[in-house]
């Protein structure tokens, strides 16, 4: 399972499955046989292993499995029967196919294995004559170690240093306590006077560090620290220093033990639960590094270098759960380049989901069974990593190809590790059926939605309670899925109590048309809703509430995309009881917006679109594929959201327009990694503005542009658009994220449109959408599409506006003469921005005329002919340029 455990860098722990309900009756001959095997393992009696096998068993196979199962010096062994089924070809009761789990440990290291074992009683044999006929498909979790803090052999430290990418941990004076394993020293506890020095290389990360600490370099004093690294890296960094032994100081020992007990379990811990009460750890891979530093000023800071990650360097504050820095090391950047996709770190593709869930919304409880059709991407795959909420207990994982499979839970990481009996080669298909259930909280609206918070210090007091709804979506991990999301078709079967309805990703179809994975899940008094998606989806979602369908209409869509297969879209509205009238009023707006966006992009992405209208204390929404949850605010006291980047006066349809735009931007077209979130949110924001112009006129559109500019100017120093969800994260101010990713992203698109012209701009967007439809996209893909349609090079444009934080300061001067106005713009030669600027001429009669001047060089001068006298010249009165202007 080598590659899988590279993912465990800072995991809280891995939990083994609960003990299987196998037979434990001592009189049971199979149990007796397994007990005998367990005794041989713990005693190390390798020479007796073959006596457990039927004479027909191949000797070579016996010796191979003997090597796998026996550990020299073993002090503990457990053999657990997990599954039992009748063995084909023998009389009933005379043979069984078993799935067995092994745990074998020495005082210092351990191994977990799972195997299929065929056992049978020979003809005319007695109960004691049962033997193993075949043992196959052993898969293992190896390399588990006990950590030993060497308090009896401390070392003297003076200017002791350990380094990793952009990090130096210096113990000026104190004591080093090695952390030992059977494979060598894998860490140290530092006690004394020290300093943590961190200086990230990327400018954007230095900016985030400045927000966190006030400086672009972190120098944090500490008295204790815990560091993990690979034994070979320890030997390379420390082995030649020949540190002298330190006298044993009882106080230093107590501090070291306290640090070790508190911080060691934070990373690489494997919690085996019923298999072992001891703590078992993995070794960090070569060059990986974890430093847990108890700083005086910032509490515990965690630095990690994790080679398995696309961005392998991070600095994290555990206490407040803040990511301070996250970026690619120089070596990683050189290997993968600036642009990357999370897909590069995906071992498999999910081709199709078949999800069957029973939901009890009042208790927030679900029972689920999901079938995943997988295709292997990596050269070979010996384990499958699934994402599933920690709150949901996995009852079984079964492969159609291999039967029941060993699975381990990664606690605190919403992860399940599934061990395969053999390595599966690239391009192979694999089908898993996962059964699970538990209590799972409804998803709150978060930074990927448009809900806005109230003003600081003002509490929302609802005059009457809202009708509840139960939302399961991309952040609840309510069904087993790939940790790196990918597009897949899906079928969702939802059973809810009487009186409730469900809306989910997909086109609703009669339940009789769908076959659930194994037997369907039901409620005693309930209704079943089925949704099927022939179009691949980024993720699956559902919402359950007391709703009624108040509107449904099928409309024709004129498509300009060659080969488009959707010419009709069914638009429906589901509304809670108090919102049914509002829902009927909403339906025509949904149709109009869908038609408008389809005209701009060239097609509709999905054949159905359902709005689930729900009560909430604040406006907002969430838009998975095929449907959107739209909040309708109830009367409140002391609630205000007007100071938010996403609050637009005079445009009540904004939230609806924004969420509907996500069906194209964010769902049909996804993003390659979190840096590219603006391709979803910035595009949805701009398309909502375009609809505002159509529905509400130029004044509302102009007000939105000015608000885009105002928030861009005030928050751009918090980080570039390309920083994605991390904007505002350190200070817990989500307005920063919305100001930069939403509003500045939309403003950038508007500047591009004015720079390239409408024809090239919208043709470029359609090309971009067509090329990346039902795929992930990056800014580089957008740039190529726009360059292809416009014939212009846009490297500098995107470098300045998406990857940079600077706001251009532009000198402006105008000269009025008879019959003409000369305008002159200047920028620094070393930091030229490409942007179109509106020059407004006010004539003597009070009329105005707007002229767009494209700025693409350090100095731009343009002569504007005039037919009447000009009284005044103004610049950027429409707020369309994100810039500061000086002069007149």
Regions found by a protein language model. Name each.
Residues 5-14:
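Bacterial N-terminal signal peptides
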Residues 22-39, 43-108, 780, 784, ...:
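Short solvent-exposed beta->alpha transition segments
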Residues 87-144:
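Exposed beta-sheet edge and beta->alpha loop/turn motif
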Residues 143-148, 152-155, 159-252, 308, ...:
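A surface-exposed beta-strand-loop module
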Residues 223, 228, 233-347, 435-550:
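Extended, low-hydrophobicity, Ser/Thr/Pro/Gly-biased non-transmembrane segments
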Residues 285-287, 294-334, 339-345, 469-472, ...:
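Non-catalytic accessory/interaction domains
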Residues 335-337, 343-369, 375-380, 388-391, ...:
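Hydrophobic helix-coil surface modules that form long, contiguous segments used
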Residues 416, 531, 561, 570-828:
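Hydrophobic alpha-helical and helix-loop surface patches within well-folded domains
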């Amino acid at each position: 399972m080598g590659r899988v455990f590279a993912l465990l860098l800072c995991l809280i722990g891995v939990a083994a499955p609960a003990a299987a309900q196998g037979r434990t009756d001592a009189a049971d001959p199979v149990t007796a046989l397994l007990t005998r095997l367990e005794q041989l393992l713990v005693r190390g009696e390798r020479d007796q292993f073959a006596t457990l096998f039927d004479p027909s068993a191949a000797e070579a196979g016996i010796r191979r499995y003997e090597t796998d199962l026996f550990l020299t010096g073993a002090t503990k062994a457990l053999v657990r029967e997990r599954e039992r089924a009748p063995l084909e070809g023998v009389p009933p009761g005379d043979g069984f196919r078993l799935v067995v789990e092994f745990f074998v440990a020495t005082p210092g290291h351990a191994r977990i294995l799972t195997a299929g074992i065929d056992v049978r009683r020979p003809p005319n044999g007695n109960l004691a004559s049962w033997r193993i006929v075949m043992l196959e498909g052993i898969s293992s979790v190896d390399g588990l170690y006990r950590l030993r803090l060497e308090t009896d052999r401390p070392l003297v430290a003076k200017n002791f240093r350990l380094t990793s990418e952009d990090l130096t941990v210096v113990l000026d004076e104190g004591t080093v306590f090695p952390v030992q394993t059977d494979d060598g020293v894998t860490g140290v506890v530092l006690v004394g006077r020290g300093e943590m020095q961190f200086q990230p290389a990327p400018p954007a990360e230095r900016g985030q560090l400045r927000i966190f600490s006030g400086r672009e370099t972190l120098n944090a004093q500490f008295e204790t620290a815990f560091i993990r690294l690979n034994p070979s890296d320890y030997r390379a960094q420390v082995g030649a220093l020949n540190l002298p032994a330190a006298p044993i100081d009882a106080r230093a020992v107590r501090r070291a033990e306290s640090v070790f007990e508190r911080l060691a379990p934070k990373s690489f811990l494997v919690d085996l639960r019923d298999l072992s009460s001891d703590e078992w750890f993995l070794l960090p891979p070569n060059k990986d590094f974890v430093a847990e530093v108890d700083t005086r000023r910032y509490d515990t800071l965690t630095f990690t270098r994790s080679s398995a990650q696309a961005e392998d360097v991070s600095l994290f504050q555990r206490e407040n759960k803040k990511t301070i820095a996250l970026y690619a090391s120089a070596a990683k950047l050189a290997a993968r380049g600036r642009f990357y996709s999370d897909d590069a770190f995906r071992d498999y593709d999910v081709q199709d989901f078949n999800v069957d869930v029973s939901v009890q919304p009042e208790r927030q409880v679900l029972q689920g069974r999901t079938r995943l059709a997988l295709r292997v991407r990596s050269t070979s795959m010996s384990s499958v990593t699934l994402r599933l909420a920690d709150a949901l207990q996995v009852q079984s994982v079964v492969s159609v190809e291999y039967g029941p499979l060993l699975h381990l839970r990664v606690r605190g990481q919403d992860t399940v590790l599934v061990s395969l009996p053999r390595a599966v080669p690239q391009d192979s298909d694999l089908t898993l059926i996962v059964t699970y259930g538990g209590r799972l909280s409804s998803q709150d609206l978060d930074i990927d939605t448009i809900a806005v918070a109230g003003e600081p210090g003002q509490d929302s007091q609802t005059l009457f309670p809202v009708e509840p709804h139960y939302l399961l979506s991309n952040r609840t991990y309510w069904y087993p899925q790939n940790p790196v999301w990918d597009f897949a078709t899906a079928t969702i079967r939802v059973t809810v109590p009487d009186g409730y309805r469900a809306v989910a990703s997909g086109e609703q179809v009669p339940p009789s048309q769908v076959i659930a994975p194994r037997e369907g899940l039901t409620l005693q008094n309930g209704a079943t809703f089925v949704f099927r998606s022939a179009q691949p989806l980024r993720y699956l979602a559902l919402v359950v509430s007391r709703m009624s369908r108040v509107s449904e209409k099928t409309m024709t869509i004129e498509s300009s995309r060659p080969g488009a297969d959707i010419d009709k879209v069914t638009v429906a509205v589901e509304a809670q009881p108090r919102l049914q009238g509002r829902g009927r009023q909403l339906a025509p707006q949904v149709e109009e917006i869908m038609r408008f966006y389809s005209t701009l992009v060239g097609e509709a992405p999905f054949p159905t679109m359902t709005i689930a209208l729900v009560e909430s204390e604040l406006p907002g929404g969430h838009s998975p594929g095929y449907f959107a949850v739209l909040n309708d605010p109830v009367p409140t006291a002391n609630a205000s959201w007007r100071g938010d980047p996403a609050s637009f006066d005079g445009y009540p349809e904004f939230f609806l327009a924004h969420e509907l735009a996500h069906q194209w931007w964010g769902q049909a077209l996804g993003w390659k990694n979190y840096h590219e979130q603006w391709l979803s949110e910035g595009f949805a924001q701009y398309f909502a503005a375009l609809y505002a112009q159509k529905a509400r006129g130029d004044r509302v559109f102009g007000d939105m542009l000015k608000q885009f500019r105002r928030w861009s100017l005030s928050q751009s120093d918090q980080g570039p658009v390309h920083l994605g969800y991390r904007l505002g994260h350190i200070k817990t101010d989500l307005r920063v994220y919305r100001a930069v990713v939403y509003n500045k992203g939309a403003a950038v698109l508007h500047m591009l449109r004015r720079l390239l012209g409408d024809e090239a701009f919208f043709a470029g967007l359609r090309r971009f959408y067509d090329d990346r439809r039902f795929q992930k996209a990056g800014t580089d893909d957008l740039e190529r599409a726009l360059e292809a349609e416009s014939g212009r090079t846009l490297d500098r444009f995107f470098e300045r506006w998406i990857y940079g934080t600077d706001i251009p300061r532009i000198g402006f001067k105008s000269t009025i003469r008879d019959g003409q106005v000369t305008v002159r713009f200047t920028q620094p030669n070393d930091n030229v921005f490409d942007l179109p600027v509106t020059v407004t001429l006010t004539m003597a009669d009070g009329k105005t005329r707007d002229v767009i001047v494209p700025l693409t060089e350090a100095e731009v001068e343009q002569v504007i002919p005039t037919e009447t006298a000009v009284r005044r010249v103004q610049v950027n009165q429409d707020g369309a340029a994100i810039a500061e202007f000086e002069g007149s």
